[in-house]
Amino acid sequence: MATVIQNPLKALGDQFYREAIEHCRSYNARLCAERSVRMPFLDSQTGVAQNNCYIWMEKRHRGPGMAAGQMYTYPARCWRKKRRLHTPLDPQLRLCELRLEAELMAKREAPQTEATALEALLRGDGILDKRNNNAKEEETLLEIQRVLEADENGDGFHDDEDFEVDTPKRKHRNKGRGRGSGRRRTEAVANDDQDKPYVCDNRYKQKHNSKTADSVCGKRYKNRPGLSYHYAHTHLAEEEGEEERETEIPQSPPVHHENHKPQKAPDGSIIPNDYCDFCLGDSGSNRKTGQAEELVSCSDCGRSGHPSCLQFTDNMMQAVRTYQWQCIECKSCSLCGTSENDDQLLFCDDCDRGYHMYCLKPPMTQPPEGSWSCHLCQNLLKDKASGVEDP
């Protein structure tokens, strides 16, 4: 017959029980803190925008019970609107502008003093007091939310730009395949600025290193993914490299030209760079692997990269030596020669050439699943090709 344990603490032990309770409390505190600082998201099942809530209270917010059976009471918090950071985009102010236009004739006949309050509201003068009150409420809410340690919740508060991720439109391309290189054509500077509206202002180095305005990067890209990849693999890599050089023996880094423009030879050809655009190493040293590796250069913009940094396969490393390779920003269709409709570009997994799906024979409507090889690689590699083209 099983024995009945009168007190479970005797079987578990006081120390074990205290540790279990402490771990449970720590887990609940971390879970509540993580939920309180979570970014708003749209629930795909219910279609409801899940947002932050303020139901998490601390022990110091407890008050005595006000009714029978109540042990504690907590202060009630009224519903409040979000603090509006962009005053010119406030929809309430836009409504005021519409009313102002509708009553334009009446306002012209009315005295000038009647419109002073509305004009002050449109200028943003009357929002200062509201912003100060909201700032005080925000500080109170942040005190409730700070349950984690200072080093753990340091990464919890970011700007909206830190969470902004643009998904590239191009299908079936390998990760990291020359994505940070900017398109460099032989056109005029004005056309280059129009084609590439995304400019790297190097805010990170200005914020932490206090560089002057002359040290702004200024590199231009045609889309945001290219700019983001350049920022992460160039400027952040430079910051990490400076921290490593403080603890190691100083070495002469490869020359990295700011405001890079494609250098041309006397015959008009593009002079390739002598450093990798990803790890900033040269042909004698790959900073990621520490080994010597040959650089692969773009024939249009001159940017270079190590095959391992570009995640090239053995077939790609042999194929790029046989034709004028293009980086992901300069990639064009090998059949029609244009880079339009880049969302329809399909990349070969053996030679890295690009093809429009509608330029293929027969044309494709959807990218194939898995690996895909162009007709050139299928004829050359036969059975060693990565994939077989769908009929």
Swiss-Prot record:
A zinc finger (PHD-type) spans 273-333, 330-380. A zinc finger (C2H2-type) spans 198-235. Expressed in the heart and somites. Component of the BAF complex. Interacts with acetylated histones H3 and H4. Component of neuron-specific chromatin remodeling complex (nBAF complex), a subfamily of ATP-dependent SWI/SNF chromatin remodeling complexes. Keywords: Activator, Chromatin regulator, Metal-binding, Neurogenesis, Nucleus, Repeat, Repressor, Transcription, Transcription regulation, Zinc, Zinc-finger. GO terms for molecular function: histone binding; zinc ion binding. The PHD-type zinc fingers mediate the binding to acetylated histones. SMART domains: PHD. Muscle-specific component of the BAF complex, a multiprotein complex involved in transcriptional activation and repression of select genes by chromatin remodeling (alteration of DNA-nucleosome topology). Specifically binds acetylated lysines on histone 3 and 4. In the complex, it acts as a tissue-specific anchor between histone acetylations and methylations and chromatin remodeling. Belongs to the neuron-specific chromatin remodeling complex (nBAF complex) and may play a role in neural development. Plays an essential role in heart and skeletal muscle development. It holds the Pfam family PHD. Residues 152-165 have a biased composition (Acidic residues). Signal peptide: none annotated. It is found in: Nucleus. The lineage of its organism: Eukaryota, Metazoa, Chordata, Craniata, Vertebrata. This is Zinc finger protein DPF3. Its main location: nucleus. One of its GO terms (biological process) is muscle organ morphogenesis. One of its GO terms (cellular component) is SWI/SNF complex. The gene is dpf3. Residues 169-183 have a biased composition (Basic residues). Residues 152-200, 236-266 are annotated as: Disordered. It comes from Danio rerio (Zebrafish).
